Design a protein with these regions (language model features):
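Active-site loops and adjacent core secondary-structure elements that bind or stabilize anionic groups
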Residues: 1-154
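C-terminal accessory domains/tails appended to large, multi-domain proteins
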Residues: 107-282
Length: 282
């Protein structure tokens, strides 16, 4: 796998690794999930001929990207434990939310904190914190033509996700190394047939975009060209951030509706006004 550069940084006491990596587009192309690309263009369920035409145009644009752009990734591996619904990373407390909807008998209401060993166990666990993005120029070089702009943006989104896919693979197999013997095809990777998850900020299990401010504190998003808006949204738009869990039973889930009681408790744990948290969760 060809990478332009990987930079390691000086570590805090609770950080086991912090790395910034630039990826070539050619490295990422096999890991693009075209199903989501077709969905973005409203082609899900459409005839294959329409998808093939769209794919051909996209591949042509990707050819032009290869000599002009790169993507960028940051990943930190940290010692961690859970404390109730909070994840403790050194002196950083990362509050999580928990499902509140009724479940079948014997099934728990889940929180991402459940996938980290509790502090009371006396055993230190680990967690990954990551972000990926594209060159800012990629989002600015296609503004004069609406169709080209939309095509470039949807490809940029896919490339940011493909970067996260490749980064997660490297974390599992070597950087963290909890699955050193993993040997999956690209199709199996895209089906997520591996141990561990990487829930992203703004998605169903971690919908609060302001979590990005905590992620920024941990891995310094500016190092890969990401800046945050007042709500924690990322610029460039084609950026992904989140957490990596290695627990063998970790899986994705949707939080669903959050009650007013938990909203207030979560705001208290975040140290932020309830109405501000309510806005972040919209």
């Amino acid at each position: 796998m060809r990478r332009a550069v990987a930079r390691r940084c000086a570590l805090e006491s609770r950080t086991t690794m912090l790395q910034y990596t630039d990826y070539n587009i050619s490295t990422l192309r096999p890991y693009i999930n075209w199903l989501y690309f077709y969905f973005a263009w409203g082609l899900s369920g459409k005839p294959q001929e329409a998808k093939d035409r769209m794919r051909a145009e996209a591949e042509q644009m990707l050819d032009s990207f290869e000599t002009r752009y790169q993507t960028h990734a940051a990943v930190g591996l940290f010692e961690a434990n859970s404390d109730g619904d909070d994840i403790l990373i050194g002196d950083v407390r990362l509050p999580m939310l928990r499902q509140q909807h009724p479940t079948r008998e014997g099934e728990p209401n889940l929180s991402l904190a459940d996938f980290i060993r509790p502090q009371a166990s006396g055993v230190t666990d680990r967690i990954g914190v990551f972000a990926t993005t594209v060159d800012l120029a990629l989002e600015h070089d296609f503004l004069t033509d609406d169709y080209q702009r939309m095509l470039a943006q949807t490809l940029a989104d896919r490339l940011a996700e493909a970067t996260a896919e490749v980064l997660h693979m490297e974390v599992r197999r070597s950087l963290w190394g909890y699955a050193p013997d993993e040997n999956l095809s690209v199709a199996e990777l895209l089906r997520e047939d591996f141990q561990g998850i990487r829930p992203a900020v703004g998605y169903p299990s971690m919908p609060d975009t302001s979590v990005n401010f905590i992620i920024d504190r941990l891995i310094n998003l500016k190092q890969i060209g990401i800046r945050l808006t007042e709500s924690g949204a990322m610029k460039p738009h084609a950026s992904v951030s989140g957490l990596m869990f290695a627990h063998p039973k970790a899986h994705y889930f949707e939080l669903g509706r959050i009650g007013e009681d938990q909203l207030r408790d979560y705001a208290h744990r975040r140290g932020l006004p309830v109405e501000l948290i309510r806005r972040f969760l919209k």
